[in-house]
Regions:
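Nuclease and nuclease-like effector domains acting on nucleic acids or nucleotide cofactors
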Residues: 2-133, 139-201
Length: 201
C-alpha cells in the first residue's frame, strides 16, 4: 500500500472553530472549566442574590406577611417556597407557610393511620410518596416562622445549602424544636378539623 503525503499549511490544518475562538477572546472560556462540577456550597452561598423588591412585592400579594418576608434570605430561598406552592397562614399563634397538597385521609402502609391521625398525635403527615413532611425555620432562628417542606424540597438539589447556613452554629435547640414540631402538627390537625366542620375542606 502506498501512502501519499500532501503538505498542508498550518492555517489550513487549524479548524474553523479554533480560528473563531482566537478572534473572539472575550467570548471564550477554558474548556477545562466545563468539567468542574457546579453546586452551591456553604463557602459560596453568600453570593446568592438577596430577596428582590419585585419578588417581595409578589409574595406580599400572595399573602406572605412581613414576618415571613423579612426572614427570607435570598431569591433562591423564595423560589423554593414558591415552587412548593406554600400558602401563608398562622399556626399556633405564629406565621407559617403550609402545604395545600396534603391528603389528610391518606393512610400509611404500615399502621393504617391517616395523615390527620398522625398530626393529632403530633407527628408529621406523609407526602404522596410516603415520606414525612418536614418543618423548616425560615431565617434559622428559634422564633422564625415555619415552612412545611418535603424532604427533597428541604435538602435536595442544593436546597440544603440555600436554606441552612452551616458556617455558623445553629441557634435552633433540637429538644425545643422537637416539642415545637409536636405542638405545631397538633395545632394544624385542629385547623383541618375546624375547616372540615365549616365545610371548607
Amino acid at each position: 500500500m502506498k501512502i501519499e503525503i500532501f503538505p498542508i499549511s498550518r492555517l489550513e490544518a487549524t479548524c474553523q472553530l479554533a480560528l473563531l475562538a482566537r478572534n473572539m477572546p472575550g467570548r471564550t472560556m477554558d474548556i477545562a472549566e466545563l468539567d468542574k462540577p457546579f453546586g452551591l456550597t456553604q463557602e459560596n452561598r453568600e453570593k446568592l442574590a438577596p430577596l428582590s423588591n419585585e419578588t417581595r412585592d409578589r409574595l406580599e400579594g400572595d399573602g406572605y406577611p412581613d414576618t415571613i418576608l423579612d426572614a427570607i434570605d435570598s431569591e433562591a430561598e423564595a423560589r423554593i417556597y414558591e415552587e412548593a406552592r406554600l400558602e401563608a397562614t398562622e399556626v399556633n399563634g405564629k406565621d407559617a407557610l403550609i402545604r395545600t397538597d396534603i391528603d389528610y385521609d391518606k393512610t400509611d402502609d404500615v399502621f393504617g393511620e391517616s395523615n390527620l391521625d398522625r398530626m393529632k398525635a403530633g407527628r408529621p403527615p406523609l407526602d404522596a410518596d410516603g415520606n414525612k413532611i418536614e418543618l423548616h425555620h425560615i431565617g434559622q432562628k428559634p422564633a422564625s416562622p415555619l415552612a412545611e417542606l418535603t424532604g427533597a424540597e428541604h435538602r435536595s438539589n442544593g436546597n440544603d445549602n440555600i436554606l441552612h447556613n452551616k458556617l455558623k452554629e445553629s441557634e435552633i435547640d433540637r429538644a425545643d424544636f422537637g416539642r415545637e414540631r409536636e405542638d405545631y402538627w397538633k395545632a394544624r390537625a385542629q385547623q383541618v378539623e375546624n375547616q372540615r366542620l365549616e365545610g371548607n375542606t
